[in-house]
Amino acid sequence: MDLDLTPGQEDFRAEARAWLAGHVPRTPLASPETEEGFAEHRAWERTLHADRWSAVAWPAAYGGRGRSFLEWLVFEEEYWAAGAPARVSQNGIGLLAPTLLEHGTQEQRARILPATASGETVWAQAWSEPEAGSDLASLRSVAVRTAGGWLLSGQKTWSSRAAFADRAFGLFRSHASAGRPHEGLTYAMFGLDAEGVRVRPVGRLDGRPAFAEIFLDEVFVPDRDVVGTPGDGWRVAMSTAGSERGLTLRSPGRYVAAARRLVALWRVAADPGDTALRDRVADAVVRARAYQLYGYACAADGPRGAEPSLTKLFWSELDLALHETALDLLGPYGELAGPAGDAPAHGGWAEGFVFALAGPVYAGTNEIQRDIVAERLLGLPKGRRA
């Protein structure tokens, strides 16, 4: 397989690099987990959208550039290499949008995607519940049929971006008589300011609300905000889960850029005689490059069923390895949340490490992903379930 980019793709890379060089904020934005920082990040989304860089692989009619998936990977490489801000639009652009493009109606795409691309609508993900995490099919929140739509009731937790987002998408049990837990589910979108919705932010160790609980009490959702066929929500949700676990939410460019930062840190902070740390840095660089080439191969060959599970295993463990190595290079300075005195450039490694610890858990635990890879990619028999 030829993994080299064409001259046209290299021209696109140069165009993206030039635009980012002229527009990426020189001063880091405040944390998106604060009200001020969220507003700054939403403004950045508008800047991206103004020149159609917010969703380059979307059709032009929805605010994109009509570029290929491979070119999106190239843009992501340049985006993270430029030190651009985190994307508060990631749930909408990276998760909901691919789902709507596959399962949504033309009306839904025309109504929702342009507002998502522009940052006008920022989305939260409402999957997990107090008793339904990786075992999502055991969810208890319900959708009850009513005239012209559905009434949603229940509780969602660990809802990313919900503290400041505008809307959310989630899964609800609409047909209680269905035999299997994966059946009888409906995929619905709802406003976080709708009557009957209460959002309770969940603070991190630093007190910032990275997540929130969402309580729903007979929240009306019109039929036009149901994605796919009512009762067939599990199939729709698996499209979203594939995006979350795969390349879309955690593109290789993010880790290639992190590996470069790790090398820069090693050059200023490493003990020249510590060959073990040197080898760990080299290993992280090689793994990031392998992930990059894997992304190119996926773009060329298309999806292969359970490959998002394989991808999720790779990026979550790579992310953790990058940050663990950085903290070991920093030594005592690794405890710092920001720059201080004569400390080597910290690069946000401490905060990133805390987030990376959750990587093997969210988007479906890595244990579950290994089961999926074993059964669907390797053809092994199903393991025993406790």
List where the protein language model places each region:
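Amphipathic, small/basic residue-rich leader segments at the start of a protein or domain
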Residues: 1-88, 111, 115, 249, ...
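A short core secondary-structure module
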Residues: 153-199
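A short, Trp-centered hydrophobic/proline-enriched beta-strand micro-motif
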Residues: 119-127, 170-171
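Internal helix-loop-helix
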Residues: 49-110, 114-119, 161-167, 288, ...
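C-terminal helix-coil-helix/basic helical segment that borders enzyme active sites and/or dimer interfaces
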Residues: 28-35, 271, 275-278, 289-342
